[in-house]
C-alpha cells in the first residue's frame, strides 16, 4: 500500500472542519474514504467523529487486509465498513455521503522513478495517475456528484502542479453546484482541492447502513 504521508493530514483536517461546521444539521455524518490503502484517513476520521458512519473502499484486497488490521489496532474496526470496490462501483445505488475524501494515484506516469526511490517499494497501482496524473481523478469526478449528499464536501489530494487542473475538472463536474477551492499544505504548496456542495438535506440521502 501507499505509505501515509504528512501531507495527507490536510485532507482529514479539511473534512473534519466541514463536518463540524454542520454538526447540528448532520449529527451522524456518513463519510467515504476512496482509495483507503492502509486505512489511515478512515481510521482518523472514525476516531475524531465517534458518531460518524465511515465507509472505506479500495480496489486492492491486500490493501483492505492491511486497513482492517490497522482499524482493529485502533479500536474502530466495527465502525468502518471496508469494501473492495473500484471507486464507487460496488457501493449500493443511491447511497450518498456527507464527506468524501480521496487520496488517489496522482503521479504522472512519466515521473514515476524506476528505482532506487522510496516509491519503488510501493505498488505502482497506488502511484500511477496516468499520462497527466489526473486519470483516476477524472473517473472519480464522473461519479462523485451522484454520491455527495446536499451540503456535502469532497476533499482530494493532488500534486502541486496538477492542483489547478484538478480544481477545474471539479468545477466542470459539479456544473457550478459546488464551491471549489485549492488549499495549500504547511509548506505553502497547492495540495488539496475542496468541493463544497450547496443546499441542505437529510445526511446520506437515500442511503441505508454504515
Label each PLM-derived region with a short phrase.
Residues 10-116:
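Conserved SAM/SAH cofactor-binding pocket of Class I
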Amino acid at each position: 500500500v501507499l505509505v501515509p504521508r504528512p501531507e495527507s493530514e490536510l485532507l482529514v483536517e479539511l473534512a473534519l472542519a466541514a463536518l463540524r461546521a454542520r454538526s447540528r444539521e448532520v449529527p451522524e455524518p456518513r463519510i467515504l474514504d476512496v482509495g483507503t490503502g492502509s486505512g489511515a484517513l478512515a481510521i482518523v476520521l472514525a476516531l475524531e467523529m465517534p458518531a460518524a458512519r465511515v465507509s472505506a473502499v479500495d480496489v486492492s484486497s491486500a490493501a483492505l487486509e492491511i486497513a482492517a488490521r490497522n482499524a482493529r489496532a485502533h479500536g474502530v474496526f466495527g465502525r468502518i465498513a471496508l469494501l473492495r470496490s473500484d471507486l464507487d462501483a460496488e457501493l449500493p445505488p443511491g447511497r450518498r455521503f456527507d464527506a468524501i475524501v480521496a487520496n488517489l494515484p496522482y503521479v504522472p506516469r512519466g515521473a514515476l522513478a524506476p528505482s532506487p526511490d522510496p516509491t519503488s517499494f510501493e505498488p505502482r497501482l497506488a502511484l500511477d495517475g496516468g499520462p497527466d496524473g489526473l486519470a483516476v481523478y477524472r473517473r472519480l469526478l464522473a461519479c462523485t456528484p451522484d454520491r455527495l449528499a446536499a451540503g456535502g464536501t469532497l476533499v482530494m489530494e493532488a500534486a502541486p502542479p496538477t492542483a489547478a487542473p484538478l480544481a477545474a475538472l471539479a468545477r466542470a463536474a459539479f456544473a457550478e453546484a459546488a464551491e471549489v477551492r485549492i488549499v495549500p499544505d504547511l509548506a505553502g504548496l497547492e495540495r488539496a482541492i475542496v468541493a463544497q456542495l450547496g443546499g441542505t438535506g437529510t445526511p446520506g440521502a437515500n442511503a441505508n447502513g454504515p
